[in-house]
A protein has these predicted regions:
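Acidic, Ser/Thr/Pro-enriched low-complexity segments and adjacent helix/loop capping patches
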Residues: 1-138
Length: 138
C-alpha cells in the first residue's frame, strides 16, 4: 500500500515532519533551527548570513506570503539550482537526524499540507547515504 500523508515525529520538544505521496518521500520539515533552509544553504556555502537576514526581513514584510526560497532566488542571493540542492540537502539531513533518535513519539495523518514543496527523493539512495554517514561517524 502506497500511502500519502504526513508522518509527525517528536522527541524532547523537537518536532520533525516527513511528507509522503504515493509511498515516496516528497519533503521533510523540522522545528530544529539547524534544519532551516537558510542555515543549510549557509553550511553548504551557497548563501551568506547577510543575504539570509535580508531575505528573512523581506519575508516578514510579505507577512509570510512568499516562501524564503522564492525570495532568495528573486533577489539573486542563490540560483534556482543552489536552492534545489539546498532543499534536497535539508530533506536528507532531517531524515538522517531521525535515524539518530533513540526514542520519541510519532503519528501518521493521511493528509498533505497544500503548500509543501514536492521533491523526488529516491528512498533507496537516501537509506544508503544515511548508512554511510552513520558508519563514518562510528
Amino acid at each position: 500500500m502506497k500511502v500519502t500523508g504526513t508522518l509527525t515525529l517528536s522527541n524532547r520538544g523537537m518536532v520533525k515532519y516527513v511528507y509522503f505521496k504515493a509511498g515516496e518521500i516528497v519533503f521533510a520539515a523540522s522545528t530544529d533551527v539547524n534544519d532551516r533552509l537558510g542555515e543549510i544553504l549557509i553550511k553548504c556555502c551557497k548563501l551568506s548570513r547577510e543575504h539570509l537576514e535580508h531575505a528573512l526581513q523581506l519575508s516578514k514584510r510579505s507577512a509570510g506570503l512568499k516562501k524564503l526560497g522564492a525570495l532568495l532566488v528573486e533577489n539573486g542571493f542563490v540560483t534556482p539550482k543552489d536552492l534545489f540542492i539546498g532543499l534536497k540537502t535539508q530533506v536528507k539531513d532531517i531524515i538522517y537526524s531521525l535515524f539518530l533518535w533513540t526514542d520519541g513519539d510519532y503519528r501518521f495523518e493521511e493528509k498533505l499540507p497544500s503548500d509543501i514543496i514536492q521533491l523526488q527523493i529516491n528512498i533507496k539512495e537516501l537509506i544508503t547515504e544515511i548508512i554511510q554517514r552513520i558508519k563514518q561517524q562510528a
